[in-house]
Amino acid sequence: MKITFLGHAVFLIETNKKILIDPFITGNPAFPKDFSFDKIDYILVTHGHGDHIGDTVELSKKYNATVVSNFEICNYLQKKGVNKVHPMHIGGSFNFDFGKLKMTPALHGSGIIEGDNIIYGGNPGGFVIYSEKSVYHAGDTGLTKDMELLRGVDVAILPIGGNFVMDVEDALKAVEMIKPKVVIPMHYNTWDIISADEEKFKKGSKQLGVKCIILKPGESVEI
C-alpha cells in the first residue's frame, strides 16, 4: 500500500485502486504544483468544508470516480452533476472492490458555503480503509474517546494544527488511545492559524512507542 501526502488533509491511497481523500487542490497553498493524477477510482470526502470537499465535483467527472461521503453531501454532489456516489453514515461499513470501508465519528462541522448561504452537509466523519493494511484518516476532528475503538490500526492519519482540530497535545492523546503501528500528521501549517510543531508530535509519538512519519507535500511512503 502506498500513501502519498498532497498537502493539508489530502491523501492518495494506492492499493489495487486509487483512493483520493479530501481533494482540496484548487487554492491549496500546500498542494505540490508538479503533481498530477493519472487515475482516480474513488474520492472520499470527510465533510463539507471547502478545504476538504474541494475539487470533488471536477475530479469525479474527469476521472469517472465514485464519491463516498455522508448522505447529505452525496445528495448535494448529485445536484452538481456527479453521477457516481456512494452515501454512508457514521458507524456504517461497506465492502468495496478495494476492501472494507468504515465511516467513523468526527467532532467538527460540515456546512457547505455557497455565497451567503451555508448548506447543511450532514455529520462530519473520518474513514478507516481495511485493505492490504488498515488506514484511519480522522478527517477534521477534536479528541474523542471513540478513537479507543480503533485501537491497533496499522496507520493513523491525524490532524495536529489546533484551533479547528486537535492540537499536538490532544493528537498525542489520540495516538495513545489508538496505538497504531504508524502515525502521520496532517492539517497543520497550511496557514498560520493552524501552525504546529510536527517534530514535537514525532518526539511524543516515539515516547508512546509509535512510529511517526512526517511527509512533505508530494512525498510517499510504502506501508
Curated annotation (Swiss-Prot):
HAMAP family, A to Z: UPF0173 (MF_00457)
Gene Ontology molecular-function annotations: hydrolase activity
This protein's UniProt keywords: Hydrolase
InterPro entries: Metallo-B-lactamas, RibonucZ/Hydroxyglut_hydro, UPF0173, UPF0173_UPF0282_UlaG_hydrolase
The family this protein is said to belong to: Belongs to the UPF0173 family.
Residues spanning the membrane: none
Name of the protein: UPF0173 metal-dependent hydrolase THA_544
Source organism, top-level taxon: Bacteria
Organism: Thermosipho africanus (strain TCF52B)
